[in-house]
């Protein structure tokens, strides 16, 4: 059997066993995708006994490529909501994440001083305990710069010992917090969805009768602050006639307007217009219809809604715009992106004409544009390879193969499309690539750790190393988790994403995502803290190495 065939076969075996382990539940809790790591350790242990070895370069490529796929698809998934999240709760989340990083750094110093743990060992344990491979590389580089090249190899051993238990510690922290606070996951998910919809311009409707005499005879576009209130006038009822208003429609006293917008904007507009009334303005039984259409025509990507001149040509109004699950109030300045879902109100023939303009080709939503994926991955790898020089540091910092693709994916997902290129990915395709990536990554990590795992575990102070790693992993997580839940009132699912992101741990994120399928809280908080945490995790071992090396 060729080297490639042997590698693929054994990693497939690792994936099968690991995924099976991950499905085993103990009191309703399972390792999930993290089981692949232990599948790798198990298979590697027995294969080593028979002298089976795999090519290191091949394994390294598979591991890094899997990680790139995982973080890139995560960025594409959460990108549309990431920047809004920064404005809403990002400061709090990042503060807690930095708290976790800071506590772990303090613990490294204490363990090094109290138990006289060699510097290369404690730095390796630190990197494994926080499940951060770039941290290991940064620590090895700085030790080499400081003249310790001959002892950096031991860092890898400390990393391998601490890494598996680093993942367990994160899952254990999530589980204990769930037990301590008697968390109802469904309730937490509902609260997150409700709060997120409110924060992200979740839309409501209101019917208002015009009673303000100052508005009589005015056109809609002449209303005070017409564009600033972020309200859509989707229907108007005059006597018994229902029709779709246009910007030049003249308003009369007694007209009833159907408004769409945020609750705050609706209330402000109601104070200007008149009184709220409980009157039906349904399109049922009339010549008007309400339809949902998807933007798929590349000719309208990046165009402002007003450039389509729908209100001038057609008896149609766009009452809502849904982008990546977030409902927005459409206005003339808003640009259209691939996958935007528009709520159209108007005559059937006019709605059909508008659908023809924007595309509404549902099958395109299931198609994957491969070119943007490889452009994004390539740009991400380039960004991760750019050295960042800071005064006083002998080694250039880098985002690496994990941080670079993530940052690029977040930006591209936020942009949405550039001419004919769009970075929308069907959820099924995104999930498939993400799961394949994390399985490849974990299978290789488990294989590398499993060969001499038991020997290392039972010798060379292996048990003590495990203890140090467990402290570095667990204490910052549980302390910050308790503080965030009690004083920060953080949603449990968001907290799980925070814990996973603070350790830059994809398996923990996969576990957190599995706590409540289909809820994006964990992924969103993970992506919110990941860029800053990755930067801190790369810098911290260098700072620790310099401080502890100088201190002797």
Curated annotation (Swiss-Prot):
GO cellular component: plasma membrane
Pfam families registered for this protein in UniProt: Asp-Al_Ex (PF06826), TrkA_C (PF02080)
TM region positions: 4-24, 28-48, 65-85, 95-115, 157-177, 370-390, 393-413, 438-458, 463-483, 492-512, 532-552
GO MF annotation list: monoatomic cation transmembrane transporter activity
Compartments reported by the entry: Cell membrane
Membrane topology: Multi-pass membrane protein
Matching PROSITE patterns: RCK_C (PS51202)
Keyword annotations from UniProtKB, A to Z: Cell membrane, Membrane, Repeat, Transmembrane, Transmembrane helix, Transport
InterPro entries given in the database record: AAE_transporter, RCK_C, RCK_C_sf, Transpt_YidE_put, YidE_YbjL
Signal peptide: none
Keyword Cell membrane tagged: yes
UniProt xrefs under Gene3D superfamilies: Regulator of K+ conductance, C-terminal domain
4Fe-4S recorded as keyword: no
Residues annotated as domain RCK C-terminal: 193-275, 277-360
Single GO BP term: potassium ion transport
Protein origin, superkingdom: Bacteria
Family label: Belongs to the AAE transporter (TC 2.A.81) family. YidE subfamily.
Xref: PANTHER family: K(+)_H(+) ANTIPORTER SUBUNIT KHTT (PTHR30445), TRANSPORT PROTEIN YIDE-RELATED (PTHR30445:SF3)
Name of the protein in its database record: Putative transport protein HAPS_0158
Organism: Glaesserella parasuis serovar 5 (strain SH0165)
């Amino acid at each position: 059997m060729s080297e490639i065939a042997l590698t693929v076969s054994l990693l497939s075996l690792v994936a099968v066993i690991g995924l099976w382990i991950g499905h085993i539940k103990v009191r309703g809790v399972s390792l999930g995708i993290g089981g692949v790591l232990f599948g790798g350790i198990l298979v590697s242990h027995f294969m080593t006994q028979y002298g089976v070895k795999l090519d290191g370069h091949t394994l390294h490529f598979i591991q890094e490529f899997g990680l790139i796929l995982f973080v890139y698809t995560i960025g594409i998934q959460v990108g549309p909501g990431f920047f809004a999240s920064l404005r809403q709760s990002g400061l709090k989340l990042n503060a807690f994440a930095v708290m976790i990083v800071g506590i772990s750094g303090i613990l490294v110093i204490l363990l090094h001083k109290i138990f006289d743990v060699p510097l290369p060992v404690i730095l390796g344990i630190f990197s494994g305990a926080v499940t951060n491979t770039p941290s290991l590389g940064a620590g090895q580089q700085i030790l080499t710069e400081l003249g310790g090249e001959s002892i950096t190899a031991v860092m890898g051993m400390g990393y391998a010992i601490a890494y598996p238990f680093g993942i367990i510690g994160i899952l254990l922290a999530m589980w204990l917090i769930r037990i301590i606070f008697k968390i109802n996951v469904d309730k937490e998910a509902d609260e997150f969805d409700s709060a997120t919809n409110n924060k992200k311009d979740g839309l409501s409707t209101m019917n208002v009768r015009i009673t303000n005499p100052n508005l009589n005879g005015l056109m809609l576009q002449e209303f005070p602050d017409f564009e600033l209130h972020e309200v859509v006038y989707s229907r108007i009822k005059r006597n018994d006639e229902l029709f779709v208003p246009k910007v030049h429609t003249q308003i009369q006293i007694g007209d009833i307007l159907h408004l769409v917008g945020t609750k705050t904007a609706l209330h402000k507009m109601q104070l200007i217009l008149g009184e709220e009334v409980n009157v039906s303005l349904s399109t049922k039984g009339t010549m008007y219809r309400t339809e949902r259409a998807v933007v798929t025509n590349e000719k309208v990507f990046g165009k402002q809604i007003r450039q389509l001149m729908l209100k001038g040509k057609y008896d149609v109004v766009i009452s809502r715009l849904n982008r990546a699950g977030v409902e927005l109030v459409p206005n003339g300045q808003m640009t259209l992106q691939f996958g935007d879902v528009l709520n159209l109100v108007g005559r059937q023939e006019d709605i059909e004409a508008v659908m023809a303009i924007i595309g509404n080709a549902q099958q395109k939503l299931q198609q994957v544009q491969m070119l943007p994926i490889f452009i994004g991955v390539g740009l991400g790898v380039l960004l991760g390879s750019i050295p960042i020089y800071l005064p006083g540091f002998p080694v250039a910092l880098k985002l690496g193969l994990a941080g670079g693709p993530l940052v690029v994916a977040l930006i591209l997902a936020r942009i949405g499309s550039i001419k004919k290129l769009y970075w929308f990915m069907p959820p099924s395709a995104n999930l498939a690539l993400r799961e394949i990536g994390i399985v490849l990554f974990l299978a290789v990590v488990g294989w590398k750790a499993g060969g001499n795992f038991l020997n290392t575990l039972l010798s060379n102070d292996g048990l003590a190393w495990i203890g140090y790693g467990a402290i570095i992993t667990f204490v910052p997580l549980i302390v910050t988790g308790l503080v965030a839940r009690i004083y920060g009132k953080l949603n449990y699912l968001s907290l799980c994403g925070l814990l996973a992101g603070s350790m830059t741990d994809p398996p923990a994120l996969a576990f957190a995502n599995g706590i409540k399928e289909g809820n994006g809280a964990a992924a969103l908080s993970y992506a919110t803290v990941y860029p800053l945490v990755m930067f801190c995790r790369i810098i911290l071992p260098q700072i620790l190495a310099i401080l502890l090396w100088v201190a002797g």
